[in-house]
């Protein structure tokens, strides 16, 4: 399962709209870097966030998710309370080709500050804005910068195409826009 290089990512982004908007070079001056890299693409977080709070709910239940436990924030940055969690989404809209799976890894700049970015793999033929999960593992408030890099997408090409893609399976997060909360069907 080879890791796909920059020229492949650029070609797919420009010809097949795999990533929109697409930044064809690494932008790093004065910001947490984003854009095309040697073997991946550093995605940006939008300016919309949902931060968890314990004011109205005593537990998180993925099968019965209560939106009242979230506070919405829009702005140039997001402050995540100590030992807490926030959701965001990518600026970029991704369209994953059928023979490819995408693994998302957090950027080391945030990891070195105790901020962990988690995303499950982007399945073959999935498309949408990626919902990002941020964990602040520190005892201090942590800052996430909008419109800057937060994670790197690594594109892995399968030896053959899968029999059933995310689109074929009518996956529940297909075509998501903005921050998408848990769905259990």
UniProtKB/Swiss-Prot annotation:
Enumerate the residues binding dCTP. 107-112, 131-133, 152, 166, 176
Residues annotated as catalytic:
133
Against Pfam families, the record matches this protein to:
DCD (PF22769)
Q: In which pathway does it act?
A: Pyrimidine metabolism; dUMP biosynthesis; dUMP from dCTP (dUTP route): step 1/2
InterPro entries xrefs: dCTP_deaminase, dUTPase-like_sf, dUTPase_trimeric
EC main group: hydrolase
For whether the record's keyword set contains Hydrolase, the answer is: yes
List the catalytic activities from the record.
dCTP + H2O + H(+) = dUTP + NH4(+)
Q: Which GO terms describe its molecular function?
A: dCTP deaminase activity; nucleotide binding
Is Ribonucleoprotein tagged as a keyword? Answer: no
Which GO BP terms apply? dUMP biosynthetic process; dUTP biosynthetic process
Keyword list (alphabetical) reads:
Hydrolase, Nucleotide metabolism, Nucleotide-binding
Q: What is its EC number?
A: 3.5.4.13
Record's function text:
Catalyzes the deamination of dCTP to dUTP.
Looking up NCBIfam families in the UniProt record yields: dCTP_deam (TIGR02274)
Tell me the subunit arrangement.
Answer: Homotrimer.
Entry similarity comment: Belongs to the dCTP deaminase family.
Q: State the name under which the record lists this protein.
A: dCTP deaminase
Q: What is the lineage of its organism?
A: Bacteria, Pseudomonadati, Pseudomonadota, Alphaproteobacteria, Rickettsiales
